[in-house]
Amino acid sequence: MDEVEFILEEAKEGMEKAITHLKKQLSNIRAGKASPSMLGSVMVEYYGSQTPLQQVANVNTPDARTLSIQPFEKSLITEIERGIMLANLGFNPMNNGESVIINVPPLTEERRKQLSKQAKAEAEDAKVGVRNDRKQAMQELKKADISEDLLKSSEDEVQELTNTYIERIDKILTVKETEIMTV
């Protein structure tokens, strides 16, 4: 029985990781509003090494269409601008001598559809991850030295777990798509 619980717990952990990864990936997909997470991939040259932007500056959103970046050291302003340009996010940073300001342009309908497709692809990847965890759990259950009744009920449990996680992925995707398509 312990072996079965271990297999189920392992499958659940893997599925949870797929959900976590999906959320992280979706947070990088930009919806209409400005958010500090949009700059999560920006690296800045800081004393000779590449450093994440969040470690060298505060990123704020004064309003829904603007990102304000306050560097901890004013000498970093040009490096921050360069980092944003190199990250290829489609932003045009401006500096006022003390901070870097980014006006986030509104998304076009075509771009919204592209982002929606990207979100669907990420969700599908997460579903594949969940299904792979199910497959692995099923194989391990078959290898386990357990009765047929226990095997059947355990397989049903794994399938139920899989269905639950697939539903969660669909809900997360629906929320993100709504966020993307909202003008």
Curated annotation (Swiss-Prot):
Keyword Protein biosynthesis recorded: yes
UniProt keyword annotation of Methyltransferase present: no
Keywords: Cytoplasm, Protein biosynthesis
Gene Ontology biological process terms, A to Z: translational termination
Superkingdom of the organism of origin: Bacteria
Primary location class: cytoplasm
GO molecular function: ribosomal large subunit binding
Pfam families per UniProt: RRF (PF01765)
Subcellular location: Cytoplasm
Job of this protein: Responsible for the release of ribosomes from messenger RNA at the termination of protein biosynthesis. May increase the efficiency of translation by recycling ribosomes from one round of translation to another.
HAMAP family: RRF (MF_00040)
Name listed for the protein in its UniProt record: Ribosome-recycling factor
Organism: Christiangramia forsetii (strain DSM 17595 / CGMCC 1.15422 / KT0803)
